[in-house]
Design a protein with these regions (language model features):
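Paired acidic/hydrophobic, glycine-rich loop segments that form the ligand-binding mouth/hinge
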Residues: 113-114, 130-135
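A ligand-binding cleft/hinge motif common to bilobed small-molecule-binding domains
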Residues: 133-151
Length: 256
């Protein structure tokens, strides 16, 4: 029941997450890890990545531009009042406000390594950049991948606050394969598939089921269990496929 689809008639939730800052713990001083100001800190000139996304970049720059006002408000406001202020600042854009935000982004531009949408993960994993405006799922994925390179990454939500976003499935009205689109969405919303998708991407599924809740709290789940590829509709594995699984396990060390 969101304002863009009050009766849930046109969209199906897919994934959700947060926007925050991913950083290299060996290169960024802990004292700098607290607010959005890290993205404007010239101590890390040419090592900062910013999202080539108007929604995210303008949102963050707006909060940064009004950081002193928000800092004072946080001392006396209730959580609801503070949230309402953030919402007003970021959703009601005036010409004066936009000019102020543009100034902050132009100032930041001189110290950036790059603007990016997807390549930032690799830049962080390879140690080319130290600071990245990141979506939570990308951060989860990159933190794990970076360990193989001996690089330690972490992720935090700045103290001024951030936003929670949702990705949704929709079917264009001019689609020629509506039935297939529905089947695909149903497939992706199956709890078992949603679990495996979540494990692969690092993002949190919007599908809620007891199985998913149990999975998210079970530390012993094998993330590399691919036996589902060989199961029939009832979850059974034939003798032929079982032999194939054992062959790949023995011959190639693949953990099916």
């Amino acid at each position: 029941d969101r304002n863009f689809d009050n009766d849930n008639q046109y969209s199906v939730p897919y994934m959700w997450g947060t926007v925050g800052i991913m950083y290299n713990t060996d290169k960024v001083d802990e004292e700098d890890v607290k607010n959005w100001g890290l993205l404007w800190n010239d101590k890390y000139k040419n090592k900062i990545l910013m999202k080539d996304s108007i929604r995210d970049s303008v949102f963050i720059a707006t909060i940064y531009a009004y950081r002193e006002e928000l800092e004072e408000l946080a001392k006396t406001a209730t959580p609801e009042e503070y949230r309402d202020k953030i919402s007003d600042l970021t959703n009601n854009i005036t010409a004066d406000k936009l000019a102020l935000v543009e100034k902050e982004l132009r100032t930041q531009y001189d110290i950036l390594y790059a603007y990016e949408v997807d390549s930032g993960k690799d830049s962080m994993i390879n140690g080319e950049a130290y600071v990245n405006l990141a979506w939570s799922g990308d951060a989860v994925w990159a933190i794990e991948e970076a360990l193989a390179n001996g690089i330690n990454l972490d992720y935090y939500i700045p103290e001024e606050g951030s936003n929670v976003w949702f990705d949704n499935w929709v079917i264009p009205k001019y689609s020629k394969n509506v039935d297939i689109a529905h089947e695909f969405i149903n497939f992706m919303c199956d709890p078992d598939i949603a679990l495996r998708n979540m494990d692969e991407t690092g993002y949190t599924t919007a599908v809620i089921s007891p199985d998913i809740i149990d999975y998210m709290t079970d530390e012993e789940v094998d993330a590399n269990d691919f036996t589902y590829l060989f199961e029939d509709n009832d979850g059974n594995i034939s003798a032929e496929n079982r032999a194939l699984i054992e062959y790949y396990n023995d011959e190639y060390g693949i953990d099916f």
